[in-house]
């Protein structure tokens, strides 16, 4: 197994400092620190302050989480509280499981 680890680049689009935005960020930080310690970069974008970024990335609802790298780009819209749903939606759960496979 290779010792080189991928770096995951993620963007979280929120609309202000609402309870949903705060909860999404807290949950996402927990998932990232638990599953991807030190191999991720997260950028939080407030679409109320930066509507042009939301428009460029075709964000229609918040919260939206986008995995930019490694390709392909994946997006999850809405509730981010379910760890498994987030990992599957971003196409990350399979890689996590395959890393733990042991050969006998």
From Swiss-Prot:
GO terms for biological process: circadian rhythm. Keywords: Biological rhythms. It holds the Pfam family KaiB. Key component of the KaiABC oscillator complex, which constitutes the main circadian regulator in cyanobacteria. Complex composition changes during the circadian cycle to control KaiC phosphorylation. KaiA stimulates KaiC autophosphorylation, while KaiB sequesters KaiA, leading to KaiC autodephosphorylation. Phospho-Ser-431 KaiC accumulation triggers binding of KaiB to form the KaiB(6):KaiC(6) complex, leading to changes in output regulators CikA and SasA. KaiB switches to a thioredoxin-like fold (KaiB(fs)) when bound to KaiC. The KaiABC complex composition changes during the circadian cycle to control KaiC phosphorylation. Complexes KaiC(6), KaiA(2-4):KaiC(6), KaiB(6):KaiC(6) and KaiC(6):KaiB(6):KaiA(12) are among the most important forms, many form cooperatively. Undergoes a major conformational rearrangment; in the free state forms homotetramers as a dimer of dimers. When bound to the CI domain of KaiC switches to a monomeric thioredoxin-fold (KaiB(fs)). KaiB(fs) binds CikA, leading it to dephosphorylate phospho-RpaA. Belongs to the KaiB family. HAMAP family: KaiB (MF_01835). Has 2 forms, fold switches to a thioredoxin-like fold (KaiB(fs)) when bound to KaiC. This is Circadian clock oscillator protein KaiB. It comes from Acaryochloris marina (strain MBIC 11017).
